[in-house]
Regions:
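Conserved Asp/Asn-Gly motif in the active-site loop of CheY-like receiver
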Residues: 24, 45-49, 104
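Short, conserved "switch-loop" micro-motifs in signal-transduction and mechanochemical regulators
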Residues: 84, 98-99
């Protein structure tokens, strides 16, 4: 069922889908590989535009979201997710490779 530009699916059909939005290829591939070897479905996206296109196809049960991204940062992606009725309840885990005191 299509509602507000997003496909709505039963809870059973999205139970294991995890989206990974990470622009660093090696990190994205590692995370997706690890999740898949845990018998979970995972799909990686390099850019927010690809991620939004994926969201129109399938709503995931979890999103792993990088903070620093091309096109728009992860915090603005999170804000958009929380503003939309169909995605505001999707759990999001923020990822970052930043480790300096300034970044904390």
């Amino acid at each position: 069922m299509l509602r507000n530009g997003f496909i709505i699916q039963s809870q059973e059909s999205i139970y294991k889908m995890i989206y990974v939005l990470e622009d660093d290829n090696s990190i994205r591939e590692f995370v997706v590989y690890t999740l898949c070897h845990m018998d979970l479905e995972a799909k990686g996206f390099e850019r927010p535009s690809e991620f939004w296109a994926g969201m129109e196809e399938t709503l995931p049960s979890l999103i792993l979201l990088d903070i620093m991204l091309p096109e728009e940062d992860g915090l603005s992606v999170l804000k958009k997710l929380r503003e939309h009725a169909d995605t505001k309840e999707v759990p999001v885990i923020m990822l970052t490779a930043k480790d300096s005191e300034y970044d904390k």
